Amino acid sequence: MSGNNSSLSYKDAGVDIDAGNALVDRIKGVVKRTHRPEVMGGIGGFGALCSLPTKYKEPILVSGTDGVGTKLRLAMDLNKHDTIGIDLVAMCVNDLIVQGGEPLFFLDYYATGKLDVDTAASVVAGIGEGCIQAGCALIGGETAEMPGMYHGEDYDVAGFCVGVVEKADIIDGSKVQAGDALIAVGSSGPHSNGYSLVRKIIEVSNADLNEELEGKSLADHLLTPTKIYVKSTLKMMESCDVHAISHITGGGFWENIPRVLPEGAKAVVDGNSWQWPAIFNWLQTAGNVETYEMYRTFNCGVGLVIALPQAQAEQAIEILKAEGENAWLLGSIANAEVGEEQVEIK
């Protein structure tokens, strides 16, 4: 045995229980603001309870989990933590609505080497704001202080969301057919995808992130939070027969649109129907990125692609615009030959 008779504590090992408790106290108000009537009890229990909304006749649960990728590294480098939580919620809830799901509740996981209560509280405040935008309850979470696993006060976040959809209203792409219209819903920027390439472009171009682009710094463009499409899309679904929705995330157009198309169908996208937001033009120029690679990595200004009957396209666009979205006719669905690519950008 060692001759050192001093008594060791968890804090000596790098885990500050008092800091964790202080964080819980700080975020109670955030959690309360996201409350839904289905939630039973508050935070602090071993598990969180939530009943199903009574309006559903045959409720089907839909779930999703995600992170924010290396956008988090950029946020840490710029010491801006108040919006990354919105990104986290958005990446989860936007995946739920593509199947028609209404988000019910959200849980987060925050892991760090050394807990900075102010930073963590700022992140959770963003998560709360995201939940408010999505209409779901922040029902619980986990804060893990793990010395030796992360460098200093670096941290990572992950989210998990559960929603509900009426069985008869599940959107699975099976109704997609030639002649359907494709509606685009605009993004707020790169959202939370492609940031390893973004950071590489910043490195090789030696970019000054304080440089202004259309009245905003590059840093602000790149850290603009991911749009949350829940309320506007659910509103549109009340009046329109949506056949499919694609959330344009990692893999861009080429990877995400085919995920919701049946065999034998392809999306014909009119590349002249919109102008890329300035940040994407900057990324392409600063990194000398080929157009194909841009569409494979970034959303290029399109956050959602919605397929529905041509006769309902104008109505859908009007509803989305009334809900504050930038929406337009993006293209149409056509028949695809065997072995043909399922996305064509003209």
Swiss-Prot record:
Q: Name one Pfam family in it.
A: AIRS
InterPro entries from the entry? PurM-like_C_dom, PurM-like_C_sf, PurM-like_N, PurM-like_N_sf, PurM_cligase
Can the keyword Protein transport be found in this entry's annotation?
Answer: no
Q: What is its EC number?
A: 6.3.3.1
Its UniProt pathway annotation is: Purine metabolism; IMP biosynthesis via de novo pathway; 5-amino-1-(5-phospho-D-ribosyl)imidazole from N(2)-formyl-N(1)-(5-phospho-D-ribosyl)glycinamide: step 2/2
Q: Which keywords accompany this UniProt record?
A: ATP-binding, Cytoplasm, Ligase, Nucleotide-binding, Purine biosynthesis
Q: Which GO terms describe its biological process?
A: 'de novo' IMP biosynthetic process; adenine biosynthetic process
The record ties this protein, via CDD domains, to: PurM
Q: What's the main place this protein lives?
A: cytoplasm
GO cellular component: a single term? cytosol
Subcellular localization: Cytoplasm
Keyword hit for Ligase: yes
One GO term in the molecular function aspect is:
ATP binding
Catalytic reaction annotation: 2-formamido-N(1)-(5-O-phospho-beta-D-ribosyl)acetamidine + ATP = 5-amino-1-(5-phospho-beta-D-ribosyl)imidazole + ADP + phosphate + H(+)
- What does the sequence similarity comment in the record state about its family? Belongs to the AIR synthase family.
Q: Which NCBIfam families match?
A: purM (TIGR00878)
Protein name, per record: Phosphoribosylformylglycinamidine cyclo-ligase
